[in-house]
């Protein structure tokens, strides 16, 4: 194919897409960890004799025990040991002991921005939280009167809330406790009446609060401290010293109260203070300025304004580094307590730092964070895009923030300040909608954790693109007039239009070019990476674009990937930044290439090795495989792609296939979004994917002796063991079906398991028969495939095994899955459906030149869903690309080149395609984009011309093989005795309340009765029914369902005398079913009962 044609000209270069992860972790190693260690120095014992100092700047990390691949293979954590220099100072003798102490293991980030924890790749998701600082809000009381309040929110510590009331009095609350007169608080802090009144711009309003305090008899600092103690610690005897200590520890102790760098920055900015950055606790000045601002709000003077808590200027992002820093602080807090106890207990003279520092609390805190925090997630590795999006995800859930249930509409909604920072499209459907978002393409997180987006400066109507773009946070952007990225400019960068739409203070207005301050970098900077891969995005409805971006993440990597004919130009960078494609770091020559490694020799003659992944299993069971695209002797330059990864072709991301598509109904097979496909997709393996399943078995130490992995399995035919080696483990390359043995294992049987005749034989002959039972690992139902890898772990090899296990064997089975009926497919515009039928090639509709159509979609799927982008992509651009033998790159939002630009561009290319000899049928001026198709079955043309083209269609990970399931007899729930639910439990299909109504509506009494009894939880009845079916006898009448008995027992346990009686008044014993079957006569069957018997009943 010829090279790609770039249609719309705009900045398509994006910044490094994983920088948000890597940059944050780098900050943690260089600054965050040192900050934490030094904030805990010195730790002093209770007598003040001993001091322990951590020299944070001198910490060091040891080389990790395993590299990344080895850690994955051994189920280990890719981590490094942390050592820090500690100094123990004895104040009495002046002696100083210095020692390097081990303080724990720190998981390290891989180059791709992930962590390997116990062999699994995990991602730490960015969390978006309310920024610490001061917030002013208004509330309406019951009478509709507006009152104002100010909240001082620290990074950690107690909240302080000032509020006004209807009597113009000021109150304060500490951590949502009872109200306290604001002036009591001021006096307790140590401010006199005049101190306060001098600082306020409207002291007359505050005087009422002073009078109220005087009336209560609180006129001095001591009285104020007593009052404060009473309110905060009711029920305890108040004292002045207690009040002082309480106040200090709540607001002025750096260990208990911390505004953080961000909180101090926000506070200074909002209240126009000049307090230095290093002061992280509250100061009297903070409190006074807050009061002053609140009074100005109440009186509506001085330019005071309320805060919008959903504005991105008031929300910040916590990335890996900061989350990890908080976790280290938790660990160090626990460690500090232990150190103080050990200082008190130990002999002062002989103590060393190593004896004091116990690494366990820190290790536990870090382990807990990576292993079980809500923000540490198992990486979505379905394809490279899923991986990349996961690392750029922003979550409002997690510890210390919202829960799904509490989040209202305001938090979830799109806010004007999201523009260019958080994608307005990509968010999950369902309960998490709006709480989980994705970083926009050009956005970055600044040092304070606020999201910034880049702009070009505009001076007198000329866009200056000479230097680097200017990054602005949401706060700064509010004060500027910002034009969109698609404004038309001439060659000198002068804006050509007379009036430009701009955003200013969260609103839209139109201004002349000389009033514009900034211009956006690119039209794509508003949306996320996944959304930016959708061509003609601007012609899609937002709901469908959302589904389109989410479904691209679920596309399965195919056996033969193909890049899209119509792309947006960002495909290359997505593939590179996902880490799926190996890239050379140096200029040089390729000196060696095979399927497993590429060696590049640089200009200095140094060899650089690039190992390729071959058929490895991803977290989602898809296949990770890399194929070289360079040849021996090629010259390469730094940054060049050396090999294709899974779902990549030519260094671009390639999630699906370009298929020939027609929009037309076909015999009802594409009713309700169903998809009709041609047999060609199966035959030519267009949508065949490789899936690798992992099976694991442990040989454990039991009470009766060790389990053994062996080939000697009791009661198994020799042919079933054909593919096992002498140890009883399947050989690599064997093809296995469901039920085949993968690893033979026998477990010792207990004495009680022996039948009496065997005990007799053993008593007579003293013959110790091999009393073991078969406990082998077998291929589960519905699974099959080829064994691609076997891994054996034993303690002798130095592997870490679970407690009680002597050996662990893992078998990897790969299967090729062709596309089949029931699989889910989708386009990039949210047009999804299930395959309803695979039609032979000769029956498919075909083009005038005889080419059969690949996929037939329903035209009714377009108008109501308003995702017209698919028509532009398929029928127009894709069709032109196919006929011109080229690929197009179209950046979304092209109206800057003129109105109706998409249609013009597309029609121009279609006309060009029709000029080729013998292809005049490609473009019909009467019906542009439509073609007269011919029915493959009859050879007759269809009545109407049909929209035909090439569209990019993906196969999604929701495969029918993983979902189809049937049950005959299986496990039952312990209490209700009903079948379990779900495929994993081999469960049954639930017949719910509404299904019962449906059967009742038709009067299907017998069907309903057996569904609720014999087929569900009538224990005796189901055994008898099975017996009757096996022996070919009539099925007996059903008995009482077990769940009814459970209900009876539950009511009886509440003390209700409830029982079942016959017409004669005799109580029926429902528990008689439990008695052995031998003593009770079998139940009558329907056939054995005469009419007379029914009357008796």
UniProtKB/Swiss-Prot annotation:
UniProt xrefs under InterPro entries:
DNA-dir_RNA_pol_bsu_ext_1_sf, DNA-dir_RNA_pol_bsu_external_1, DNA-dir_RNA_pol_su2, DNA-dir_RNAP_su2_dom, DNA-dir_RNAP_su2_hyb_sf, RNA_pol_bsu_bac, RNA_pol_bsu_CS, RNA_pol_bsu_protrusion
Record keywords: DNA-directed RNA polymerase, Nucleotidyltransferase, Transcription, Transferase
Disordered as annotated region, ranges = 1073-1097
Statement: the UniProt record of this protein carries the keyword Cell inner membrane: no
MF (Gene Ontology): DNA binding; DNA-directed RNA polymerase activity; ribonucleoside binding
Q: What is its EC number?
A: 2.7.7.6
Task: Give the enzyme class.
Answer: transferase
**Reaction equation(s) it catalyzes:** RNA(n) + a ribonucleoside 5'-triphosphate = RNA(n+1) + diphosphate
One family name in Pfam for this protein = RNA_pol_Rpb2_1
Report the GO terms under cellular component: DNA-directed RNA polymerase complex
Q: Name one GO biological process term.
A: DNA-templated transcription
Keyword RNA-binding on entry = no
Family classification = Belongs to the RNA polymerase beta chain family.
Q: How does it assemble?
A: In cyanobacteria the RNAP catalytic core is composed of 2 alpha, 1 beta, 1 beta', 1 gamma and 1 omega subunit. When a sigma factor is associated with the core the holoenzyme is formed, which can initiate transcription.
Q: What does this protein do?
A: DNA-dependent RNA polymerase catalyzes the transcription of DNA into RNA using the four ribonucleoside triphosphates as substrates.
Query: NCBIfam families recorded for this chain?
Result: PRK00405.1 (NF001616), rpoB (TIGR02013)
- Put simply, this protein is called DNA-directed RNA polymerase subunit beta
Per the UniProt record, the lineage of the source organism begins with: Bacteria, Bacillati, Cyanobacteriota, Cyanophyceae, Synechococcales
The primary gene name is: rpoB
